[in-house]
Amino acid sequence: MQTKHNQIVARIEQFGPGKAFSAKDFLDIASRTMIDVTLASLAQSGKIRRVRRGLYDMPKINPALGGELSPDIDEAARAIARRQRWKIVPEGAWAANLLGLSTQVPAKIIYLTDGPNNEVPIGRRSIHFKHARPKAMAGLEGKFALVVQALRHIGKEGIGPSEIEKLRSSLSPAEKRRLVKDARFGVDWIYEVAKKIAEKTA
């Protein structure tokens, strides 16, 4: 039978490189005190990286240079949201970048949230959590939320065949079907785009 320490290590290895996490992701395994001690020990030994207070990751390695890559901002945001029990949705330009619809990383990385306004430094960047009314967050979940935010940012006239194909390749068949289902109750043009994205799905 695995020790609590080994169970925590096993879960981190299961997360894989790039995944951000906090003590809250292990509360089903051990006490908070033991988790904190274990994570601090792993960080000190170099097995994981301390991104900021209470937030860690197993860094990805640059295959060409061999050094550690910067923390994944989206992973960090999601780990913070899990810890705080917030619902978050990437806003506009950042959503478009995450989906590959834009190569430009926005100067300000914003997530809509049902939590409070907050700014969290991560490396050389900052994550801005922007409180949104419940009505604005209603129905926005998973990939659907990401796609809708990106489409709203780009606009109807900015969506062409190449954008459709990029979105099509980034979604699983199940996600495409869910996108069409959820988009039915939203803006008409977004629903039409959703149908085009899913039309080749079996």
In which residue ranges do the predicted regions lie?
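Amphipathic alpha-helical interface surfaces
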Residues: 35, 91-92, 143
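Short, isolated positions in well-ordered beta-strands
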Residues: 127-129
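Short beta-edge/loop segments at beta->alpha junctions of small alpha/beta modules
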Residues: 2-79
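Short coil/turn segments at secondary-structure boundaries
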Residues: 22-23, 108-110, 163
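Short gly/ser-rich loop at a beta-strand->alpha-helix junction or flexible surface loop bordering the NTP-binding
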Residues: 51-54, 84-123
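Positively charged, aromatic-accented nucleic-acid-binding surfaces
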Residues: 29, 79-80, 91-94, 153-159
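Hydrophobic alpha-helical interaction segments
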Residues: 131-202
